[in-house]
Amino acid sequence: MKVCLGGTFSIIHAGHEALLRRACQLGDQVVVGLTSDEMARRRGKDVASYEERKRHLQEFIQRICDVETDIVQLDDAYGPAATGACDAIVVSPETASIAAEINTIRQRNDIAPLRIIMVPYVLADDGIPISSTHISDGEITDGHRITPLHIAVGTASETKQAAAKTAFQHLLGHLDIQCTMVPVKTPENPAGEQVWKGARHRAEQSLGNADYGVGIEAGVIEHHGIAMLEHVCALLDSAGYLTWGTAPAFQIPAEMAEKLHDTPIGDLVPKGEESLAAYLSHGAVTRQHLMQEAVTAALLPRLHGRH
């Protein structure tokens, strides 16, 4: 089977190695598309020359791969994969959409679709996918974070900020974590899918130049006709990798749930109480605790697959 993959390979790292090793495991012939200098310029990438990158790539492949391998120049996003020259393509989650576009082109030209093999991200110890940009910017070396980790929480609530910072410190406490707030507006009293959409919107709007955008939203959802209060967290990083987490949802007491159609849930909590959870538990469980649980859950997938 002929397997293809592509990239710029400006700085060869553990993520590239995972892709190349997978391609060499699957195929008896591997075709590696290497971004041309012109294509790199069009994408705004300041990289070494094609010939220099090709030489480094050839040396690396010789160390890890024992099947026939060809390096070809890529002048567009699709390369030889769109013309029928390959049987399968190895991609990362970041480039999976390109593979789908290639298959659309192939089907349009009556060429059998490629088998798409997705290789998971290889993460640095900050939970963010390793990339040449992060290495060249001096943020990571050998998979280890060497600069402060900047977290931007999409909120004006100090409670949400504290919940996010505590969760990050608990799981990534070996890093220098800096946490700021970015006020983000979402619809009041979200319910159902609005809770998830609101969390994602907060994460996207807060990211900016930070390493993580954190979106936390809470609202009423229904499970089998039962009104529940759920806290949701969306974590979006500077590489575009999005992960999710929720805190345990709990049932809203029936006498309160009956009033939800015309009364915001916050107005059902007696004055002076921190939250519905705190009111029901007599302070044993707080809103901050539940939000921290949601952020912690969203971080868990990022602890797997670290270099």
Region spans (language model):
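Nucleotidyltransferase catalytic core that binds NTPs
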Residues: M1-I151, K160, H170-D176, K185-N189, ...
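Anionic-ligand binding patches
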Residues: N189-H307
